[in-house]
């Protein structure tokens, strides 16, 4: 679910994990390795000069199948919708405003991507 929202095309079985404590109890591991999300590969696959919406359409998932929506449908059919996001567009804008280490062009692109994904998956948000 989170990979569909952030267009992380690099989720695979080497970055899905569980935690175990000293008693042998297991727990879910926090999500990690999201470096391929948000069209991050601007040098080869997702150039900054490209149309962001076309590029978003080209992203393919890897875990179960190549389509994020199909993966999401499978997950929700098996486990229901159990992930909700609690951030708003205002939160995204504020966060990006403070990410001054990144060029404005990158921050604007990230905002465009996240806003589009928030619209697409609005049912996953408490308030958009």
Regions found by a protein language model. Give the residues of each.
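Anionic ligand-binding catalytic core segments
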Residues: 2-8, 12-13, 17-128
């Amino acid at each position: 679910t989170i990979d569909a929202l952030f267009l992380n095309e690099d989720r695979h079985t080497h970055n899905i994990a569980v935690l175990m404590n000293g008693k042998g109890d297991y727990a879910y591991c926090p999500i990690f390795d999201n470096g391929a999300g948000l069209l991050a590969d601007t040098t080869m696959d997702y150039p900054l000069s490209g149309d962001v919406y076309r590029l978003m359409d080209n992203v393919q998932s890897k875990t179960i199948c190549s389509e994020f929506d199909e993966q999401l449908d499978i997950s929700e059919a098996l486990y229901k919708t159990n992930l909700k996001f609690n951030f708003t567009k205002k939160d995204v804008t504020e966060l990006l405003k403070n990410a001054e280490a990144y060029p404005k062009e990158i921050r604007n692109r990230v905002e465009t991507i996240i806003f589009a994904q928030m619209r697409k998956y609005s049912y996953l948000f408490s308030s958009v």
